[in-house]
Curated annotation (Swiss-Prot):
Lineage of source species: Bacteria, Pseudomonadati, Pseudomonadota, Gammaproteobacteria, Vibrionales
EC number assigned by the record: 6.1.1.14
Protein species of origin: Photobacterium profundum (strain SS9)
NCBIfam families according to UniProt: glyS
GO molecular function, a single term: ATP binding
Subunit structure of this chain's protein: Tetramer of two alpha and two beta subunits.
Protein name: Glycine--tRNA ligase beta subunit
Length: 689
C-alpha cells in the first residue's frame, strides 16, 4: 500500500494565547487516536500552531485501510442442527443476518466445543473517505471550556473558522468542518508576505507558509527565536532577561513572525518597587524585564513584535510610549500611598467583605492577629511582631497600588511597612504571608512570617468549611493550596504543632458565625487528604501513606517522620512477612469479643515458639520505649523487623485459637502487645511489598 503525507490546517480568528499549545497538542493526540481506531498506519504527527491557525502534518500515512477478515461466531453446532442434521431456525437466522447460507459457514473448534463461524472479508476503505470525519472528530474533542458561535449557524468552536485545507499528498480531501469547506487556500501574515496563496502538496508545508506567507508555523521554532533573541538582546545592554517560561509561551502564541527588540524607560521609575514595575511590564504589556548581575532591575525591557519593520526605531518608540503612562501610574500610586501609614487603613477593611457569612476583611484581620500570636508562641517566634503583622496583613488591599495592580498585594504591604518604620520581621511577614503560593514555591523565611501565613490559611479553611462550603469540583477560595501550604510550613520547618489544637483555636475566633458542627473533623480530614497527593509526588508509595493515615496522626511533622520510616521499613527483607503477620493478627483480634489483659502470663506459655516470642516482645517493648519517646520511628521499625523469625516460628508451630480459653487469651494478649508496638508507627498490615 502506498504512503503519502497528510496536511490539515484550520485557519481561524485569533486564538487564546494561553490555550494555544494545549489546543495544538490535544488536536495532535486526538487525531492520532482517531487514526489508530480507523487502522490507518502512519509514521508520525507534527503539530503547528500560530495565533490564527492549528495544523497537523501526518508523515507516511497509508492511503487506505488494509483488507481484513472479521470472524463472526454463530450458534453452537449442537444448537445449529436438529437430530436429522437439518439447520435449525437459530442457524438459519444467523446465516441470513450475515448474508450467507448455513452451508457456506465454517466450523470453529475449541476445547469448549464447536460453533458455526463466518469469516467475513472486509475491504479496507481508502483514506480519502475517512480523513475528513476523523479530523472533525478530533476537533470536536478539544478541551474548549467556552466555545463560541458565529454567523447565523449553530456551529461552535473556540474561535470562528475562516479556512480549511486538507491535502493527502497533492490530492485535495473534500469536506466541511466547522462551517469551512476544504480548499487549497492558505492565509499568510496579516501585514507581510502574501495574504492568501495556493498550496499544491502537503509536502510543501510549513516551508511554503514561511516563504510566501511570512508565517513561522512551527511553535517551538518561534519560541527558540524569542529565547535566543531575548538573551542576546539583554547581554547587549549588560543585563539578564527575565524569561519566565509562562510568559515566553504566551508571547510565542501571540506572534506569527517573531522579531525581538529592546526598549528603555526613564531611570527615575526605578524608585518605584521593582515588583510594581515588573507587574506592569510582564502582566500588562507582555514585556521581558532586564536585571543586572546583582539582580537589580535596569531601565530596559525586551519585547517581541509580530512584524519585520524597515524602521524598528518607530516600533521601539511606540512601545516606550505605551509603557510610560503605566509606569507613571505606578509611581504616582506609590508616592500617594506612602502619605498614609498602613495602620490608618484598618477602618477601611470594615467596608470590604471577606465572605458574607464570615464578615469583613477587618473581622478576618482580627482573627489572624490572635491566631498568629498563638502560633508564634508555640514555635518560639516573637509574639508581639506576629500580632502586629497579623493586624497589618491586609491593609495594603486598601492602597491605590494594589487596587490597580492586584498581584502586588503583600509585596507592597512590605514596602509600605518599611516606609512606616515597622519592624523588619513585621514588614517581611506582610509579603511572606501568602507563601507558598504554588507547588514548589519558597516558604516564609522567619517564624513571624510563618505564624502569619499559617494563621491566614487556617482561618480561611476553618471559616469556609464552617459554613458548609468545602470544595468539590471548583475551589474558589484555594483551600487545597492553603491546606498544603500549612502542611509544608509545619513539616519542612519541623514545627511541633498539632492540627487539632490549631483548628480548635481558629474555630473559637469565629464565635457563633459557623454553622457546621463537624468543622474541626472535616478540616483535619481534608488536610490529611492533602498528604496523600504530596507524598505520592515525593515518591512514596500509596500503601505506605495509607498505613500512616490509618492512625490519623494530626501533627504534620510527626506524620512526615512516620511516612519516611515506613518507606524505609518497606524496603527491608522482613517487611512482607511482618506486614502479612500484622494483617493476620488484626483479623484474629477482630474476631475476639472481650477485653485482653495488659500483660502476658508466663505460666501459660507452653510451646517453645510462644515462649521465645513472648520473651522477644517483652524485651522489645522495653527497648522501644525511649525510641518512641524520641520519635525515632525508623529505628523502631528496624528493631521490630528483627522479630520476623520468632513471629514466623510462632505462627508455624502454635495454635493461637486454642480450645483452652486461658491459653487462647494469653496468646492473643501477646499478639496484641506486638501489634500495638507496630501501631505506634503505622498500620503495617496495609504495607504491600
Amino acid at each position: 500500500m502506498t504512503e503519502r503525507n497528510f496536511l490539515i490546517e484550520l485557519g481561524t480568528e485569533e486564538l487564546p494565547p494561553k490555550a494555544l499549545r494545549t489546543l495544538a497538542e490535544a488536536f495532535s493526540s486526538n487525531f492520532e487516536a482517531e487514526l489508530k481506531t480507523a487502522a490507518l498506519v502512519h509514521q508520525g504527527i507534527e503539530w503547528f500552531a500560530t495565533p490564527r491557525r492549528l495544523a497537523l502534518k501526518v508523515t507516511a500515512l497509508a492511503t487506505g485501510q488494509a483488507d481484513s477478515v472479521v470472524e463472526k461466531r454463530g450458534p453452537a453446532i449442537s444448537a445449529a442442527f436438529d437430530a436429522e442434521g437439518n439447520p435449525t431456525k437459530a442457524a438459519q437466522g444467523w446465516a441470513r443476518g450475515n448474508g450467507i447460507t448455513v452451508e457456506q459457514a465454517d466450523t470453529l473448534k475449541t476445547e469448549k466445543g464447536e460453533w458455526l463461524l463466518y469469516k467475513q472479508e472486509v475491504k479496507g476503505k481508502p483514506a480519502q473517505e475517512l480523513l475528513s470525519g476523523l479530523a472533525a472528530a478530533a476537533l470536536a474533542k478539544l478541551p474548549i471550556p467556552k466555545p463560541m458561535r458565529w454567523g447565523n449557524n449553530e456551529i461552535q468552536f473556540i474561535r470562528p473558522v475562516k479556512t480549511l485545507t486538507m491535502l493527502l499528498g497533492d490530492e485535495l480531501i473534500e469536506g466541511n468542518i466547522l462551517g469551512a469547506d476544504s480548499a487549497r487556500i492558505i492565509r499568510g501574515h496579516r501585514f507581510m508576505g502574501e495574504a492568501e496563496f495556493t498550496i499544491d502538496n502537503a509536502d510543501q508545508y510549513p516551508a511554503i507558509l514561511e516563504e510566501r506567507g511570512k508565517v513561522m508555523a512551527n511553535y517551538e521554532a518561534r519560541k527558540a527565536i524569542i529565547l535566543e533573541g531575548a538573551k542576546k538582546a539583554a547581554l547587549e545592554v549588560g543585563g539578564i532577561a527575565d524569561l519566565e517560561d509562562e510568559l515566553v509561551e504566551e508571547v510565542t502564541s501571540l506572534v506569527e513572525w517573531p522579531v525581538v527588540l529592546t526598549a528603555s524607560f526613564e531611570e527615575n521609575f526605578l524608585n518605584v518597587p521593582t515588583e510594581a514595575l515588573v507587574y506592569t511590564m510582564k502582566g500588562d504589556q507582555k514585556y521581558f524585564p532586564v536585571y543586572d548581575a546583582e539582580g537589580n532591575l535596569i531601565p530596559k525591557f525586551i519585547f517581541v513584535t509580530n512584524i519585520e519593520s524597515k524602521d524598528p526605531r518607530q516600533i521601539i518608540e511606540g512601545n516606550e510610549k505605551v509603557v510610560r503612562p503605566r509606569l507613571a501610574d505606578a509611581e504616582f500610586f506609590f508616592k500617594t500611598d506612602r502619605k498614609r501609614p498602613l495602620v490608618d487603613r484598618l477602618p477601611e477593611l470594615e467596608k470590604a467583605i471577606f465572605q458574607k457569612q464570615l464578615g469583613t476583611i477587618k473581622d478576618k484581620t482580627d482573627r489572624i492577629t490572635e491566631l498568629a500570636g498563638y502560633i508564634a508562641e508555640q514555635i518560639g517566634a516573637d509574639v508581639t511582631n506576629a500580632k502586629r503583622a497579623g493586624l497589618l496583613a491586609k491593609c495594603d488591599l486598601m492602597t491605590s497600588m494594589v487596587f490597580e495592580f492586584t498581584d502586588t498585594q503583600g509585596v507592597m504591604g512590605m514596602h509600605y511597612a518599611r516606609h512606616d518604620g515597622e519592624a523588619e520581621d513585621v514588614a517581611l511577614a506582610l509579603y511572606e504571608q501568602y507563601m507558598p503560593r504554588f507547588a514548589g514555591d519558597k516558604l516564609p523565611s522567619t517564624g513571624v512570617s510563618a505564624a502569619v501565613a499559617m494563621a491566614d490559611k487556617i482561618d480561611t479553611l476553618v471559616g469556609i468549611f464552617g459554613i458548609g462550603q468545602a470544595p468539590k469540583g471548583s475551589d474558589p477560595f484555594a483551600l487545597r493550596r492553603a491546606a498544603l501550604g500549612v502542611l509544608r510550613i509545619i513539616v519542612e520547618k519541623d514545627y511541633s504543632l498539632d492540627l487539632v489544637d490549631l483548628i480548635a483555636k481558629a474555630r473559637a475566633q469565629f464565635g457563633d458565625k459557623l454553622t457546621n458542627a463537624n468543622v474541626e473533623d472535616e478540616v483535619i480530614d481534608f488536610m490529611l487528604g492533602r498528604f496523600r497527593a504530596w507524598y505520592q509526588d515525593e515518591g512514596h508509595s500509596v500503601d505506605v501513606i495509607l498505613a500512616v493515615l490509618a492512625l490519623r496522626p494530626t501533627q504534620p511533622a510527626d506524620f512526615d517522620k512516620r511516612v519516611k520510616a515506613v518507606s524505609h521499613f518497606r524496603s527491608l527483607d522482613a517487611a512482607e512477612s511482618l506486614a502479612a503477620a500484622n494483617k493476620r493478627v488484626g483479623n484474629i483480634l477482630a474476631k475476639f469479643d472481650g477485653e485482653l489483659p495488659l500483660a502476658v502470663d508466663s505460666s501459660l506459655l507452653l510451646e517453645d515458639a510462644e515462649k521465645a516470642l513472648a520473651e522477644k516482645v517483652e524485651a522489645m517493648i522495653a527497648t522501644l520505649a525511649p525510641v518512641f519517646a524520641e520519635g525515632n520511628y525508623q529505628q523502631a521499625l528496624s528493631e521490630l523487623a528483627t522479630l520476623r523469625e520468632p513471629v514466623d516460628a510462632f505462627f508455624d508451630n502454635v495454635m493461637v485459637m486454642a480450645d483452652d480459653e486461658k491459653l487462647k487469651v494469653n496468646r492473643l494478649t501477646m499478639l496484641n502487645l506486638l501489634r500495638n508496638e507496630f501501631l505506634k508507627v503505622a498500620d503495617i498490615s496495609l504495607v504491600q511489598k
